[in-house]
């Protein structure tokens, strides 16, 4: 029987220490500590690659996802995810898969938080499945049920400059035409 209230995380994890631009011995020791503590299979290979400086950046994101999954599994959560290790930011990540979105630069949201704001300059179209690769990778490495955090369409629209839609509305002749849009 399924649990009435399965446990799951809400939000993101901090980036894995080895995803920093500069990887020092401190980050390597932290990676080794967490790899051992979480029981990450093969973490020794990652530590060796970090020490030698011979690694592929994309592979580090794979490792970060595995560490995130193991973190939540070892915490005993019923439904897990990777803590959004591959995502730049919850808005920018999906917007990079939308044709018609042009990034204008960073805007301040909270005290020190910023995000890269886009404008919708033409009819928006999805260029690829946004979350599929993340899900398939996590599915291969998780031993628990998965959830995929999705940034909803309201947030994507609200956080974007609607230039295309303003232009379409300006071109409409009557109030009735505008209502149909």
Residue positions per predicted region:
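Domain-level signal for soluble alpha/beta catalytic cores
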Residues: 1-181
């Amino acid at each position: 029987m399924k649990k009435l209230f399965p446990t799951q995380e809400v939000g993101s994890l901090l980036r894995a220490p080895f995803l920093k631009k500069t990887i020092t011995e401190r980050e390597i020791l932290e990676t080794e500590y967490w790899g051992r503590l979480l029981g990450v299979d093969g973490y020794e290979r990652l530590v060796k690659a970090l020490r030698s400086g011979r690694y592929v950046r994309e592979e580090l994101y794979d490792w970060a996802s595995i560490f995130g999954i193991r973190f939540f599994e070892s915490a005993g959560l019923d439904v897990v995810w990777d803590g959004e290790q591959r995502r730049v930011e919850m808005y920018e990540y999906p917007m990079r898969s939308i044709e018609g979105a042009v990034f204008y630069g960073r805007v301040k949201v909270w005290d020190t938080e910023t995000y890269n704001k886009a404008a919708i300059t033409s009819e928006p179209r999805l260029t690829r499945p946004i979350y599929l690769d993340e899900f398939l990778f996590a599915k291969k490495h998780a031993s628990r049920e998965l959830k995929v955090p999705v940034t909803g369409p309201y947030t994507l629209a609200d956080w974007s400059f609607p230039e295309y839609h303003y232009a379409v509305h300006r071109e409409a002749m009557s109030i009735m035409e505008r209502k149909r849009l």
